[in-house]
Amino acid sequence: MIGILDYGVGNLKAFANVLKGLNFHHQIVKTEQELKGCEKIIMPGVGSFDSVMNKLIESGIRDVLSDLIINKKIPILGVCVGMQILASSSEEGSKSGLGWIRGRVKKFNFDRSDFSLTIPQIGWNEVNSTKENTLLKNLEKNPRFYFLHSYYIECEDKKDVIAIANYGGDFTCAVNRENIYGTQFHPEKSHHNGVALIRNFASL
């Protein structure tokens, strides 16, 4: 069963609709007992880094989530700020992240004389894989995904980076370390490429 983590933030129904269309057994989960029944977990996130971390802590499931991911090696997909909190820390706030992906979340910083670039980045952008990875298989060449963000992860270990995009310069937009996956873009809003990526994760 694929659990869509409900800790007060994130676009849960969109993921549920995609998984339903793909005929994967899924459930929106919010309790420790529900989490323990999951074979895979999707962790959406919308808002600021600190507010999302606070929601996760207040939900009372951070410890059981860590046990499932770090000790039992359950696959997890963090999306948008759900990916950012996989990192150790963020320029956006003072809270520590989960630290499962070593790195720091940074804000876009580029020449604002290019008026075509705004912060946040809102809209479609091309994603380029940096290595072969199961999460990104069977996508069209140079696939486009939907982004809505002002921050991105700068990974300490470049081996964790599986895809980049360009917005005033290259930035990490997808990561993977062992059973831990993350996308800065929103696959649930990205039509056929997003559906293919969610299918890849659900099929791990």
From Swiss-Prot:
Organism: Leptospira borgpetersenii
Compartment annotation: Cytoplasm
Pathway the protein acts in: Amino-acid biosynthesis; L-histidine biosynthesis; L-histidine from 5-phospho-alpha-D-ribose 1-diphosphate: step 5/9
Origin: domain of life: Bacteria
Active-site residues (renumbered): C80 (nucleophile), H186, E188
Assigned keywords, A-Z: Amino-acid biosynthesis, Cytoplasm, Glutamine amidotransferase, Histidine biosynthesis, Hydrolase, Lyase
Gene: hisH
Parts forming coiled coils: none
Catalysed reactions, semicolon-separated: 5-[(5-phospho-1-deoxy-D-ribulos-1-ylimino)methylamino]-1-(5-phospho-beta-D-ribosyl)imidazole-4-carboxamide + L-glutamine = D-erythro-1-(imidazol-4-yl)glycerol 3-phosphate + 5-amino-1-(5-phospho-beta-D-ribosyl)imidazole-4-carboxamide + L-glutamate + H(+); L-glutamine + H2O = L-glutamate + NH4(+)
Annotated Gene Ontology cellular component terms: cytoplasm
Molecular-function annotations in GO: glutaminase activity; imidazoleglycerol-phosphate synthase activity; lyase activity
The protein, known as: Imidazole glycerol phosphate synthase subunit HisH
GO annotation, biological process: L-histidine biosynthetic process
Known role: IGPS catalyzes the conversion of PRFAR and glutamine to IGP, AICAR and glutamate. The HisH subunit catalyzes the hydrolysis of glutamine to glutamate and ammonia as part of the synthesis of IGP and AICAR. The resulting ammonia molecule is channeled to the active site of HisF.
Chief location of this protein within or outside the cell: cytoplasm
Enzyme Commission no: 4.3.2.10, 3.5.1.2
Subunit record text: Heterodimer of HisH and HisF.
Domain called Glutamine amidotransferase type-1: residue spans: 1-204
